[in-house]
Amino acid sequence: MEPFSKKSYQRKVEAIFTRFPSVQKVPFKDAYKPGLENMLKFEGVLGNPHKSLRTIHVAGTNGKGSVANMLASALSACGLRVGLYTSPHIVDFRERMRIVGEKQSAELVSEEYVYDFLCRYEADM
C-alpha cells in the first residue's frame, strides 16, 4: 500500500469518483444501478455494520440536509455519539462524513482515516 500523503489521498478519492460515478455529479440514468446486489456484497465486505448500529435514514424531496443536521444536533445534545453522512459535498469529500461531538461541533473525518479505508476495501468495491 502506498503511504499516506495529500497526493495519494487525492488520487484515491478521484479513483472512487471515476469508478463510481454515482458518488459524484452525473446524469441520473448513468448513476442508477437497479437492484441491491452490489450494496449487499459491499455490506458483507464491511461486516454488515447496519446490523449493529442504530440509524435514522432521512429521505424525501427537500430539506434532508437540514433535518439530518437538526437530528444530529438534538441527539448529540442528549449525550449520544452521532455520526452524520450527507451528500453532496461542497469542497472536500470528507464534508459528507462527520462525527458530532459533545460540544455539538462537527469535525471532518481525517484524510488518513478515509485513505486507510479506501486502501483496505479498494479490491472489494
Regions found by a protein language model. Give the residues of each.
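Short, basic, glycine/proline-bearing loop/turn elements
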Residues: 56-57, 123-125
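N-terminal phosphate/diphosphate-binding loop that engages ATP/GTP or pyrophosphate donors
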Residues: 69-124
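Short functional linear segments
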Residues: 1-60, 66-69, 73-78, 85
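Short active-site-proximal "capping" loops at secondary-structure junctions
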Residues: 63-64, 90
